[in-house]
């Protein structure tokens, strides 16, 4: 008797009467050598309602010798799964709906034609963002591995994609959590009768501080600044103590304590795996929607709110003729849904094999897009109120972009409305919970990837590995906690992570659709869901989605953003530095390709064939066990 690898996922047979199938905790199909007599019946595939041929049939038939084998793990070795389906959905929604939905989408929408922007945004979502989102969920759920080891089952030569994703995740964690630290500082500062950014009588204020909402007659000059702006720049960031990237200054101990608290919450939320993080997101993923609803109702009742809504949605159809509008729409939907970061692969890998990931992709994508749209009303009703109070045009009030829109403009509006303390507390608490969800997801993507790749080292030491990851991210964040840390945050966001993750996602889409094969991928989906993806999805995966990513990358390279923060213009060398940081992650892909081709024995043609052929079987469920099949 001998065992041989499975030639097909369909060639599964049961051991005769279940005898001698178990060895060292693993079920094995005994395959006879030539001359042995074989009697076997096929078994149910375990996920289809239709029984396989021979299932439940007493008829026995012979099969060719040495054609099939079975290696199935016992049920107790099963991969961890989500406690409930809703845990997975809330985790994915919490990951996709982040701070960018609140500040980036509203700003980009009004800047690119208001209501007219929804047309390119919807088109890019349908043909680019959602197909990539669906692809990653299906890949993760079928192969049940993180972003590194999954490539052994798809196309081994592209394993460098997984390492690149892990490095990108580290860069993101280095600056993203700093924004949460700012929000936490604001939250702590909000527990006062009078919010500290409402007046110019504080120690950090300058002679240029001018309060728009003061009862005194005021004169606004070119150099005038609001109390909210000075609180953000001079008290929270202390950016006046830095001369720029060439001299960042010291570390703000207040922000360092805030980020330590943030990382502590993160650690105890994810240290035990998806069983614990899946429960935490019941709070962190739902709380923002409660607060958004409260803020929406409050904003709609403010005087002048209609001015903000009109400014937000009034369509400028001429904008649709500008290429930049379509670029912004494509970039926004991609970074909002978040394919290419390894998170969707990790989350989906903990699903049950026959979970309807197609439905999940559609539901979570729609929820994400609708959240962005509704967030625009939350922001612009308040901006309309500010414009009414200042007797200015909304465009003058809404000139701030990025974090400044939240920490200066919106914070100032909250400070000058009734019950300001209450609304400030819930608003900044909402920002923190939005950020926590995304950080949980980003780090889980890395943790799952490393644990799956090195199970013999870390499988029983997850808590220690998570601690090491969190500590590493904390030390990586120190440069963003300096007095000039805001300059670093903007540089990392614009240059170090954006282009890199776009390129990684493009190569991933090509590797799956062209090398692994769209036909094989669709077969995998059919085995899970019972139906094959239609032609729309196939065309998107093979051509439209890769072109969608290539379009964004080329547009970025042809017209890179000019960096400016407050009154500081970034030096030219900083752009080169940003590209170098981004390249440091992407370089993992060609480096691993070269390593693979050099280390694989055989002729050059044989090396290529071996390198693009899956080398590890994928487990297929069969009743109470999982079957390994090639």
From Swiss-Prot:
UniProt-annotated glycosylation sites, renumbered to this chain: 208, 217
Post-translational modification: Phosphorylation at Thr-276 increases 5-HT uptake and is required for cGMP-mediated SERT regulation.
The name this protein goes by in its record: Sodium-dependent serotonin transporter
GO biological process, one term: platelet aggregation
PANTHER family: SODIUM-DEPENDENT SEROTONIN TRANSPORTER, SODIUM/CHLORIDE DEPENDENT TRANSPORTER
Bridged cysteine pairs (disulfide): 200-209
Chain positions with Phosphothreonine modification: 276
Chain segments annotated as transmembrane: 88-112, 116-135, 161-186, 253-271, 278-297, 325-347, 361-380, 422-443, 464-483, 495-516, 539-558, 575-595
Organism domain of life: Eukaryota
Localisation per UniProt entry: Cell membrane; Endomembrane system; Endosome membrane; Synapse
Topology in the lipid bilayer: Multi-pass membrane protein
Gene: SLC6A4
Stated role: Serotonin transporter that cotransports serotonin with one Na(+) ion in exchange for one K(+) ion and possibly one proton in an overall electroneutral transport cycle. Transports serotonin across the plasma membrane from the extracellular compartment to the cytosol thus limiting serotonin intercellular signaling. Essential for serotonin homeostasis in the central nervous system.
NCBIfam families associated with the record: Na_transp
